[in-house]
């Protein structure tokens, strides 16, 4: 999920990223993570050129230690991404999920619904209706888009 800080000082989604798709044909999970990392680097490169930014700032949500599910695959994916960023000389910073939640909602214990409500209050974008019409609970990709919005906002407008 890609957002950028535009010249009118607003956080905007990158439209061209939505016109490209990450790779779907892969041989193994590690191959998939490598293809996704390469696609991400390509998107960052295109953004840097398209918007003529002298410096690219990247922020990544760090691991959540209470995560359930495919935590090892997530770690492998993130490790490959960080490695590729370093190979391409892109600097990045990490932010803890609780720090991001506190920044967005004033509470580090907020849930996905709280994050979405705050996002909607700020942007008036109805992501839930667009991406998960049948679902009542907030889930991917809606929660991922909300998180990426607040990651960008945190980078551009850090807390004092």
Language-model regions: role of each:
Residues 1-160:
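Phosphate- and other anionic-substrate recognition elements at nucleic-acid/protein interfaces
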């Amino acid at each position: 999920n890609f957002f950028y800080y535009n010249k009118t000082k607003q956080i905007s989604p990158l439209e061209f990223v939505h016109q490209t798709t990450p790779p779907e044909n892969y041989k193994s999970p590690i191959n998939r993570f490598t293809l996704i990392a390469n696609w991400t680097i390509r998107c960052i490169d295109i953004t840097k050129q398209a918007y003529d930014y002298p410096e690219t700032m990247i922020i990544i949500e760090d691991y959540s230690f209470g995560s359930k599910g495919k935590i090892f695959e997530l770690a492998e994916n993130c490790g490959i991404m960080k490695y590729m960023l370093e190979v391409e000389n892109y600097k990045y910073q990490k932010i803890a999920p609780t720090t991001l939640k506190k920044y967005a909602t004033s509470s580090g214990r907020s849930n996905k619904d709280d994050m979405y409500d705050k996002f909607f209050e700020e942007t008036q974008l109805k992501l839930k209706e667009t991406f998960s019409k049948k679902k009542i609970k907030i889930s991917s990709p809606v929660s991922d888009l909300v998180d990426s919005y607040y990651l960008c906002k945190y980078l551009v407008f850090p807390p004092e």
